[in-house]
Amino acid sequence: MIFDKEDFESFDPELWAAIHAEEIRQQQNIELIASENIVSKAVMAAQGSVLTNKYAEGYPGKRYYGGTEAVDVVENLAIDRAKELFGAKFVNVQPHSGSQANAAAYMALIQPGDTVLGMDLNAGGHLTHGASVNFSGKTYHFVPYGVNPQTELLDYEEILKIAKEVQPKLIVAGASAYSRLIDFAKFRQITDSVGAKLMVDMAHIAGLVATDAHPNPLPYADVVTTTTHKTLRGPRGGMILTNDEVLAKKINSAIFPGTQGGPLEHVIAAKAVAFKEALDPEFATYIEQVIKNTQAMADEFAKVEGLRLIAGGSDNHLLNLKVLDLGINGKEAQDLLDSVHITLNKEAIPDETLSPFKTSGVRIGAAAITSRGFKEAEARKVAQLVSNALVNHDNQEKLEEVRKAALELTHQFPL
């Protein structure tokens, strides 16, 4: 039985109220969190389908349960579409998340205690790239690399120097808060010079890679991991890609039975839908607009005294701002903007002096507002609203003006 809204509300009013409140929040808030997006009705329909009832441990054609003919078709569709989308020979669509994908990739590539290079959190790296509180930092010996202190860009010569000093078994390229292009060819040269493997986490830029708006890491990386949401605009989940048959077998074993049991076939179906959408030429137009909107916002922020664009701007879907010089930290900025219907997140910056719970900066992404229909004019308006709120963070009258303007903008572009 499939509940409609009225049935759901009647059956579980408390849960329905919470879901409805979130629906209203999404309708009324300008979403700038770089890792969030707005999926299609088709993606949601697939994820809410009867496939959620089916257990399917194993892989298509090699399951540990019967009755898997239909889910085999579903999973193979997702695999084949991902191969076409990214030019990969082998794809595993079963990871429940990006973190699960990274965990399995590490298991396939290295041994516990091995030395790994990963991007420092303050420079834009992810928890799974070696943070001491994360499984990655607890299981493997991660050595961080950062960015040039002056340019705040990846310093490939410095990364090479570190690699030669520590002789890693693996180098991880990719980030969760880096706004510039990543040169995967240079990373390949570095890994080859020390006899290491190269893993690329393209979770944030997968949508850009799919449309050639960012260089594809697959020709250079031994393994590529990603999420399927963010710029790819699919369901929350993970994926692993490689062109190496031997590694593909190790990856499959690392996912099942290594780190997961039954795959979420309803989510895999939603991934298949998202990949089909991403193969449509309209998706390339969408990504092009995402980049235009990001750059339009960057141009506006650059005009504001007291705000600093980290790395001088953006080549992708996100940008980072230092807000501390305005007399407000990242957490305070996040809470302040949330109160005026603008959602973003606090973010550490390369020269960070505050704790991860406060931070000196914020991260801003254009994927969700672009899905909503915003173009450059609206993106510039959004940047102006954010700037006005931050500059006037103690002025309730100005903040009320921002709140009303933000609501008006979301009403003009309903979900």
Curated annotation (Swiss-Prot):
The lineage is: Bacteria, Bacillati, Bacillota, Bacilli, Lactobacillales
Q: How does it assemble?
A: Homodimer.
Involved pathway(s): One-carbon metabolism; tetrahydrofolate interconversion; Amino-acid biosynthesis; glycine biosynthesis; glycine from L-serine: step 1/1
Task: List the Gene3D superfamilies hit by this protein, alphabetically.
Answer: Aspartate Aminotransferase, domain 1 (3.90.1150.10), Type I PLP-dependent aspartate aminotransferase-like (Major domain) (3.40.640.10)
What cofactor is needed? Answer: pyridoxal 5'-phosphate
UniProt site (Plays an important role in substrate specificity):
H229
Give the signal sequence positions: none
**Family as reported in the entry's similarity comment:** Belongs to the SHMT family.
InterPro entries referenced in this protein's UniProt entry, alphabetically: PyrdxlP-dep_Trfase, PyrdxlP-dep_Trfase_major, PyrdxlP-dep_Trfase_small, Ser_HO-MeTrfase, Ser_HO-MeTrfase-like, Ser_HO-MeTrfase_PLP_BS, SHMT-like_dom
EC number(s) in its UniProt entry?
2.1.2.1
- Modification type N6-(pyridoxal phosphate)lysine: residues: K230
Q: Name one GO molecular function term.
A: pyridoxal phosphate binding
Entry superkingdom:
Bacteria
**Mind telling me which GO cellular component terms the entry cites?**
cytosol
Functional summary from the UniProt entry? Catalyzes the reversible interconversion of serine and glycine with tetrahydrofolate (THF) serving as the one-carbon carrier. This reaction serves as the major source of one-carbon groups required for the biosynthesis of purines, thymidylate, methionine, and other important biomolecules. Also exhibits THF-independent aldolase activity toward beta-hydroxyamino acids, producing glycine and aldehydes, via a retro-aldol mechanism.
* Protein localization: Cytoplasm
The reactions it catalyses are: (6R)-5,10-methylene-5,6,7,8-tetrahydrofolate + glycine + H2O = (6S)-5,6,7,8-tetrahydrofolate + L-serine
Q: List keywords of the entry alphabetically.
A: Amino-acid biosynthesis, Cytoplasm, One-carbon metabolism, Pyridoxal phosphate, Transferase
The protein's matches in PANTHER family, at most eight in alphabetical order, are given as:
SERINE HYDROXYMETHYLTRANSFERASE, SERINE HYDROXYMETHYLTRANSFERASE 1
The protein's name in its UniProt record = Serine hydroxymethyltransferase
| Record-listed (6S)-5,6,7,8-tetrahydrofolate binding positions | L121, G125, H126, L127, S355, P356, F357
Any single biological process term in GO: glycine biosynthetic process from serine
